[in-house]
């Protein structure tokens, strides 16, 4: 059995430039893929630029289906002040496939009004084809995951979090 080949892709810029198989999900004060947070730090009271990412099945292999997409964050967002990691990922009342728009650092970005889970969600929270019950049976993409970090003026720098992406693969 050959497992499916899966990568995380990110879209940036006006007109949407897609980068395949990104190396990190770092967030900061500019719209950039594989961002260096030291070069683009987030000032207290500011918001990161929204990230638009997709789970991309580049080859289904001998699998019959990829589904049950789950995304969450582990690790603290920092000390002092109020921080929020907001997203369009949700367990219920899914708003359907999010359309790409030039990334901004203002909030709220349409449909990114949920708190990013900090543990594995019980069920899918990112859709395929506009539905949380969607599935890929050939090479293809998830819906966009939109996510962004917001802070207040009392926030202090220096946090590290990890984005987690999980899916079910059926033989």
What is each stretch, according to the model?
Residues 1-171:
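Long, small/polar-residue-biased beta-strand-and-loop interaction regions
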